[in-house]
Amino acid sequence: MIGIIGGTGIYEMAEYGRLERRGSLITPYGKTPEISVFKLHGRRVAFIPRHSPGHDKPPHMVNYRANIWALKELGVRQIIATNAVGSLKRSIGPGDFVVPHDFLDFTRSRPSTFYDEKTVHVDMTEPYCRNIRSALSGSSGVVDGGVYVCTEGPRFETPAEIRMFQTLGGTVVGMTGLPEAVLARELEMCYASICLVSNYAASISPSKLTIDEVFEIMDEKKNDLIDIIDAAIRDLKTEQSCPCQHALRGADVNNHEEELYEGFNDICKPEKEEQHHDGP
């Protein structure tokens, strides 16, 4: 099953397939927003609105652990996340799409691991799944590669912070991409992001940053974003051939790998999916 974590502007994604069910899940970390499970191109897809349907959860208050855990419980093995971002480069402007290959984490107060009671050091040498990245960047006009900088929010960044991020090699800056990527890796799920640039970052932009421009760009480009995700779902194979699915090998100091996410073995069995493309 494929999971889609929808950010600003694409809450209609669930209407593009054949709806099977819809509802919230109770996890050890709390209740999730309403998740829609539907069929698209022969694949089962679970869509979860990151901020809740009314966009009433600010980035630093999103229950990232509950969202990722719930997707794992549903049997999701591959996650496509969408993120609205500001650009740190003049060559990448509002309306452009970026598929990052790495990240810088400047979040501070968010629960960022499932392993508070076990000593687990998951490898992040390749932070985003190569297979999903390839599927997303196959669409025309998508920038393949970049460094995603995640800040705590909910405020926008200062000019000094933006200069620091640029010096460190950042490409885009947002508030929602982490700890999602890490949590997915800790549960051995494939994860990649498609970022839509909504504005230039502070001091690069000639004007004051507002949330209005974020929503304006998302509204203008949401159909293109949905098309990119749709094409990626068509291209993604059910069989995994990437390191993501073995991320916990060698990660547990006490070598109790089989106990790290006890309870998923019966729930998350390999999915048998149709291989034909039957369209929305």
From Swiss-Prot:
The keyword Transferase applies. It catalyses: S-methyl-5'-thioinosine + phosphate = 5-(methylsulfanyl)-alpha-D-ribose 1-phosphate + hypoxanthine. It comes from the Archaea. CDD domains: MTAP_SsMTAPII_like_MTIP. InterPro entries: MTAP, Nucleoside_phosphorylase_d, Nucleoside_phosphorylase_sf. It holds the Pfam family PNP_UDP_1. GO terms for molecular function: S-methyl-5-thioadenosine phosphorylase activity. The record marks 157, 211 as: Important for substrate specificity. Keywords: Glycosyltransferase, Purine salvage, Transferase. Its EC number is 2.4.2.44. Phosphate binds at residues 8, 50-51, 176. Substrate binds at residues 175, 199-201. One of its GO terms (biological process) is L-methionine salvage from methylthioadenosine. GO terms for cellular component: cytosol. Pathway: Purine metabolism; purine nucleoside salvage. Homotrimer. Catalyzes the reversible phosphorylation of S-methyl-5'-thioinosine (MTI) to hypoxanthine and 5-methylthioribose-1-phosphate. Involved in the breakdown of S-methyl-5'-thioadenosine (MTA), a major by-product of polyamine biosynthesis. Catabolism of (MTA) occurs via deamination to MTI and phosphorolysis to hypoxanthine. Belongs to the PNP/MTAP phosphorylase family. MTAP subfamily. Although this enzyme belongs to the family of MTA phosphorylases based on sequence homology, it has been shown that conserved amino acid substitutions in the substrate binding pocket convert the substrate specificity of this enzyme from 6-aminopurines to 6-oxopurines. This is Probable S-methyl-5'-thioinosine phosphorylase. It comes from Methanothermobacter thermautotrophicus (strain ATCC 29096 / DSM 1053 / JCM 10044 / NBRC 100330 / Delta H).
